[in-house]
Amino acid sequence: MNTIIPLLLLSLLITVYAYALEDGNKEEMQDIAESEFEASNEMLQLAHLLEADRAETEEDRNSRQKRCWGANVPCEDENSPCCPPLKCEKTFGYGWWYGSPFCVRSGSG
């Protein structure tokens, strides 16, 4: 009996000490997990900012004035982007020689 009581007390102290260490480890692991989550959250926010910036520059690039087609360039129809003094017209030889109309000065064909 004299040996059993100290062994039980020793096992009780070891168990309490192990639980205390486990709680400390849990807190440390939780802190590490939170810091990793914060780092990944910051990376995610940075990725969103870069994506928004890329979309903004894409809008800026697409907002420039569209280029027009010069003289004697084949065009599809009247809505083709010929330069202002030019119009998309069917010139002489259209159909049997030329396959499409051309951007020409108005009334020259």
Swiss-Prot record:
Propeptide stretch(es), residue numbers: 19-67
Q: What is this protein called?
A: U26-theraphotoxin-Cg1b
Tissues/organs with expression: Expressed by the venom gland.
Name the domain of life: Eukaryota
Q: Where is the signal peptide?
A: 1-18
GO MF = sodium channel inhibitor activity; toxin activity
Which keywords does this Swiss-Prot/TrEMBL entry list?
Answer: Cleavage on pair of basic residues, Disulfide bond, Ion channel impairing toxin, Knottin, Secreted, Signal, Toxin
A Pfam family per the record: Toxin_22
Q: Where in the cell is it found?
A: Secreted
Cellular component GO terms, alphabetical? extracellular region
Free-text comment on this protein's domains from its UniProt entry: The presence of a 'disulfide through disulfide knot' structurally defines this protein as a knottin.
Cysteines engaged in disulfide bonds, as pairs: C68-C83, C75-C88, C82-C103
What is the source species? Chilobrachys guangxiensis
